[in-house]
Amino acid sequence: MSKQVRVRFAPSPTGALHIGGVRTALFNYLFAKKHNGVFYLRIEDTDQNRFVPGAEKYILEALKWLGISPDETIGKNEKFGPYRQSERKHLYKQYADLLINSGWAYYAFDTSESLDTLRKITEAAGNTFIYNHTVRETLDNSLTNSPEKVAERIANGEDYVIRFKTPVNETLHLKDIIRGDIKFETNLLDDKVLFKSDGMPTYHLANIVDDHLMETSHVIRGEEWLPSMPLHVLLYRAFGWEAPEFAHLPLILKPVGNGKLSKRDGEKLGFPVFPLQWKTNEGTSLGYKENGFFPETVINFLAMLGWNDGTQQEIFSLEELVQKFDLNRIHKAGAKFDPEKNKWFNHQYLVKKEDSTLAELFLPILASKGIVTNLDYTTKVVALVKERAHFVNELWDLSDYFFIAPTSYDEKATKNWKEETPELMKQLIVVLNGIEDFTSLNIETIVKDWMTQNEIGMGKVMQPFRLSLVGKMMGPHLFDIIEMIGKKETINRIEKAIATL
């Protein structure tokens, strides 16, 4: 690309970062890294009424956990700082005044009460009230007041807003990287408020000013901002600035039904919609981290929501995503969220991890259950059972018999315990006692030779043998279990089963 790529993630600190916002951040990050550009984070906190303490810190921590921290943000490489809009508000009034002076904006003194009244009258007549070119020259603003009167009212401290003066009778031909050519009729647009009576800019003005001053090359954001695109392009024209390129991402859709994924969907169907835990007065919402997902899992499944590389490949490292990412391969249609597929992704990453790494994550779970063990033994256990796990916290249910003897036996499996079983198990104990080299392959060879020589059917021994050691008909290769728990423990468990069953 001819100019340096600079892209931003610009959330509002109004609560926990939703998974849809995380995907927007991810796609910006991938695009920046693909083109050796800069990914920066800007906090858009102009709406102080919706500001939530702790939300800004949460956003930064979530991006850090996911491994997609910004190159520039608050307190980090502040080349174009400040990166909080509330600390830049002195700038916005200057630019609002520029628009006033160039005729692209005007002061409006209409009270909310007068506009509400006008809105009700219009709706009663079966129409929709829009503050635009059809009514602006009949309302209380600087287009209908003399310059002297306007100056007097402002000097007297009267409340006002600054509205954009949308051009009339124009068709805007705009281009979106994902959606292609788009047309907008300016006559259908309203005169948006750019500067509020509280002295703060609206999103539209602050966004355009900051994107220009921070040299943003591409705006990659959710499709909910597509209706704002014509206003934003017109603002660039009004200022005489070159507009960035735009790419509006498809929605993340509900797993069932129609519409955009929401926090309520997660609560109803039992899956997280936040990257990290979020606490409010109403309660605590666990995030993907607390639910046992690896950060690379979240990155991977979010990347596949609305994008693919044109192949059948589904598992991508962050480095591979950077290499293959292309905005032109993002779909226009919304992407359905699939909680079960996300678990599959986590399983793929779990089985790829080093056994010792998983063991280190598993040890605190074992300690919480009063199990005293070591990393070496736990690593061997993990190697035998991880293929069946989606999450680290599932390892206990898959491997508890490696650490404690069964306290009960699966009722269905006890049907394999026949009248002759106790005698066969006693003979098996004798065989096991005679084995010196107590390793999996050697134990298996000797036990199977004994069964063959005595013409004992495999099922008559192996099923009750597994039931004695595990308590159920599951688990890895039986002789691997035997080697792990050792001769003494193996025999003790068989004797307990004989006495119990």
Curated annotation (Swiss-Prot):
Protein source organism: Flavobacterium psychrophilum (strain ATCC 49511 / DSM 21280 / CIP 103535 / JIP02/86)
Function: Catalyzes the attachment of glutamate to tRNA(Glu) in a two-step reaction: glutamate is first activated by ATP to form Glu-AMP and then transferred to the acceptor end of tRNA(Glu).
Single biological process term from Gene Ontology: glutamyl-tRNA aminoacylation
Name of the molecule in the record: Glutamate--tRNA ligase
UniProt keyword annotation of Transmembrane present: no
GO terms for cellular component: cytosol
An example Gene Ontology molecular-function term: glutamate-tRNA ligase activity
Enzyme class: ligase
Reaction catalyzed: tRNA(Glu) + L-glutamate + ATP = L-glutamyl-tRNA(Glu) + AMP + diphosphate
Gene3D superfamilies: 1.10.10.350, HUPs
Segments carrying motif 'KMSKS' region: 260-264
Annotated TM spans: none
Keywords: Aminoacyl-tRNA synthetase, ATP-binding, Cytoplasm, Ligase, Nucleotide-binding, Protein biosynthesis
Keyword Cytoplasm: yes
Family per record: Belongs to the class-I aminoacyl-tRNA synthetase family. Glutamate--tRNA ligase type 1 subfamily.
Enzyme Commission identifier(s): 6.1.1.17
Top-level taxonomic group: Bacteria
Gene: gltX
UniProt cross-references to NCBIfam families, sorted A to Z: gltX_bact
Cellular compartments annotated: Cytoplasm
